[in-house]
Each structure stands twice: as structure tokens, then as C-alpha cells.
Amino acid sequence: MAPDVSPALRAVAQGAAAAGALAAGAALGVFAARSIFRGVTRSASPDVSAVVRGTQRTVLAGDGVLLHVEIDESDVPLTVVFVHGYALTLETFRYQRAAMQGKARLVFFDQRSHGQSGQGEFDSHHIDQLGHDLGLVIDAVAPHGPLVLVGHSMGGMSIMALADQRPDLIARRVFGIALLSTSAGGIHGLHHALPLGLSRAFDVLAPPIAAALAKRKDLVERSRWQDTDLGLLLIRLYSFGSTGTEEGSRFVASMVSSTPVEAIAEFLPALQAHDKRESLGNLEGVDLLVMVGDKDRLTPPDRSVDIVERIPGAEFILVPDSGHMLPIEKHDLVTQALLALLDRARRAAMEHAAGGVA
């Protein structure tokens, strides 16, 4: 018999889902965040005035969903594709975008049902579909030349799905991969993230609760939190491992609040079911960077260690006093590590070309 989610739904509607925000972006907390920060606008996001918007493109996915893509051109013969996470947008990488413009050709896109991309159907909200979408974006806007792939959270899972589906592409063209705050084996067992040992119940109840909330979107959207300071605290708890800044918290909240309720609900089971550990071998031979915050509650460090142990030679950076939103919370460190990866990838691609390998 399926769990009776009615009491839980009522509790969420009354605001009890605030505790779920401690689960680092899992559905219940994201719903709470959406209610708290519905009034937050883009104007509250960090000021990165150096960012110059490049060419905007639309890529048609196999099922007709339109994927929003932005390209910052460069004469450097290397393309870097950035893939954002769950309930976020391509703006996740705005600091890296500002620092890396001109150093490579940069490609950013909103995953389906996120940001400015089109809404997918229920049965398309899974990690394998995101891998197919990523492959189509590469085929459409970067069909030739060496690549570096950068994925944060669910974006890292998308890269793993692509490697599972198209190992030939990885072997031929990808010279660097950065997996930031991600997991090769789902997001189960957040016992340390939820108080009072509630994570087991969360694992069982969250998907049906999320589905019920999606059906009652009007109920969720009407929810309001009057205490904005409390809302900011919750976002800090799930996003940042350090004190963080109110500006950064509002920026994360603005991305969360822009994500459709249906997408938040329907992607959660996919995050829990995700398991690409057996196909990580397809990344061998690629310069791999793995980074995670030591206080990441959604994809804790042991998930990154699991990836590194399966890929000989992978670089592992454990970032102290950091949570799940590394590209924002510790943007300088992330940018520095990515620039070093780009330099290595560029040299490797040049050596590859000089060797006459197709």
C-alpha cells in the first residue's frame, strides 16, 4: 500500500516543510524555499558586471523541448560546456563565466524544465534524458574540436549519463571533465542532513509528497513566509557551509523560485534513482577534476570519494567550510581549479592534434 501522504501534505502546506530545506535542495526544502523567496528578483543576485552575454541559441531536443543555450565565442580552439544542477539555472556559473571569457569558447544552457528552457513531459524528467539533451547541445553548437565538460550537482549526473550513452564522444573529443558537488549513486540516506533521524522517512515519503504538491501547485504557490530572515537562514543551511552572504543566498533563492513546481517534484525520484557507478570507467583517460564541500548536505564528500576511487589519476579537492553551492560560495577557488584544468586540456588537445590522431 502506498504511504498516506495527506497528513504530510497538510504539514507542508502549513510550513512544516522548512525542515526539509536542510536536505540541501531536495524537493521538500526546495518547495519551502520557493514559498519563502517568491518575491526575490534577479536584482538581488551577485553583481558580476564583467559578464558580457554572447550568442543565444535554441536547441531542439528529441521530444520537441526547446533548450536555451548561450555561447561566449573565443579564438581559443577549446569549448567548455557548463551544466547546472537541480532547481538552478545556467546563472550558477556566472562567476566562472566572468573570469573565463576569452580563455576558451564557453557554452551554457538551461536544462529542460529549468531557467529559460522549455518544459518537458513527466516521463522525460530523468537523468538519462538529461544526458541525451547534453549530447544534442554539443552536436548542435560544438560539433567539432576538443571539449571540456563542467557539471555541478545534477549537471554532473548529466555528464555521467552522456559518458554512459556515448563513450566514443568522451574518448575522441573530451580532454577535461569537472564534477562539482555531485554523485554517481543517487542522493539516498541523508541521515546527517535531516534532524531527528528523519531521512529514512524522507527517502520513502518525499517522492509521493512531491507528486501531491505538484498536483496542488496552487496550494504551494499561495504559501508565504513572512519572516524573510528565517528563509535566508534556511537557504544558507542547504547551500552554504560557511556563513555566506545574504546576497548569495538571495541569488540561489532566485534560481530555485524560478523552477516550475512540476520539475522540482518530478526530478526528485530521478535524483534518488541515479546510479552510473558502473559506467564511470568510460571517464578513464580524461583529465578529471572532482570537487566537493566538506559540509555538503546533498552530495556529501563520500560521494565524491567514491567517484575518485573508481577513476585512477582523478584530482580530488575537498573544500573546507563549504556546502553544496561551490560555484557561488567558493567561486574563486572553483574558477582557479577550472582554469588549471583548461590549461591542461588545451595542452593535451594540442599534443593530440600534433600526433595526427583523428
Q: What residues fall within each predicted segment?
A:
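Hydrophobic alpha-helical topogenic segments used for membrane insertion/localization
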Residues: P7-R38
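N-terminal cap/lid segment of alpha/beta-hydrolase-fold proteins
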Residues: S45-L67, I71
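Conserved HGGG/HGGXW glycine-rich cap/lid loop of the alpha/beta-hydrolase fold
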Residues: V65, E70-Q119, A140
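Active-site loop/oxyanion-hole signature of alpha/beta-hydrolase fold enzymes
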Residues: S113-S158, D164, D168-I170, Q336
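Flexible "cap/lid" loop of the alpha/beta hydrolase fold
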Residues: D164, D168-L219
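Conserved alpha/beta-hydrolase catalytic His-Asp/Glu region
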Residues: L213-N282
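Short beta-strand/loop motif that positions the catalytic acidic residue
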Residues: L283-E284, V290-V292, D296
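Catalytic active-site module of serine/aspartate enzymes centered on a nucleophile-bearing elbow/loop
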Residues: P312-A358
